[in-house]
């Protein structure tokens, strides 16, 4: 069984969907009238599996997960709008996209954000609003795979390198037909995902 095309798009507020064209290994299409049941078990590929790379992203980076490349600790965050993160010698540029986690005292500082570089040691989190006072902790990780959409939710206003990168997942399709015969195949699902930040 081969999946010829699979797409998954996740607009804000909607659920994922898949589109696929399926045929068996010999190219004989199994029609719906012949099928008693179809089951699909989807699971992620282990880190390090080989996948195709697009948009300039190297295969090693693609295989390491959604957030790759630079990362560093956070030593401060302002109680201001937008939130300004202190991270010495961060090396980021305006319009880069980061995932922030582990910041204590300001819950809104955690998440995925486009950033604006303030100086060599600080950057602001675009569209953020503080809801507390920084106490400690936090790390940020540079994201290569996220697109930032404008207020109209349609215009891409910024993205990391490789924002079109497809993710690879594996799935088991089990097709039972003619009551007694069952075909089970492991297939690769190349998934393209757009996430609003």
Across the structure, where does each feature detected by a protein language model lie?
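Contiguous segments within soluble domain cores/interaction surfaces
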Residues: 1-68, 142-197
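Small/polar beta-strand repeat architecture
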Residues: 68-144
């Amino acid at each position: 069984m081969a999946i010829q095309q699979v797409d998954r798009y996740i607009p804000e507020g909607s659920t994922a969907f898949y589109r696929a064209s399926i045929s068996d290994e010999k190219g004989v299409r199994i029609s719906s009238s012949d099928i008693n049941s179809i089951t699909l078990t989807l699971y992620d590929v282990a880190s390090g599996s080989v996948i195709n790379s697009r948009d300039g992203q190297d295969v090693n980076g693609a295989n390491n997960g959604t957030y790759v490349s630079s990362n560093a600790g956070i030593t401060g965050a302002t109680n201001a709008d937008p939130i300004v993160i202190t991270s010495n010698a961060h090396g980021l540029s305006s319009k880069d996209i980061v995932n922030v986690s582990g910041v204590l005292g300001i819950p809104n500082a955690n998440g995925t954000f486009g950033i604006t570089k303030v100086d060599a040691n600080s950057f602001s989190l675009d569209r953020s609003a503080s809801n507390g006072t920084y106490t400690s902790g936090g790390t940020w990780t540079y994201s290569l795979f996220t697109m930032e959409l404008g207020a109209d939710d349609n215009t891409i206003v910024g993205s990391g390198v490789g924002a079109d990168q497809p993710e690879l997942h594996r799935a088991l399709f089990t097709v039972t037909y003619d009551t007694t015969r069952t075909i089970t195949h492991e297939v690769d699902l190349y998934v393209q995902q757009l996430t609003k930040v």
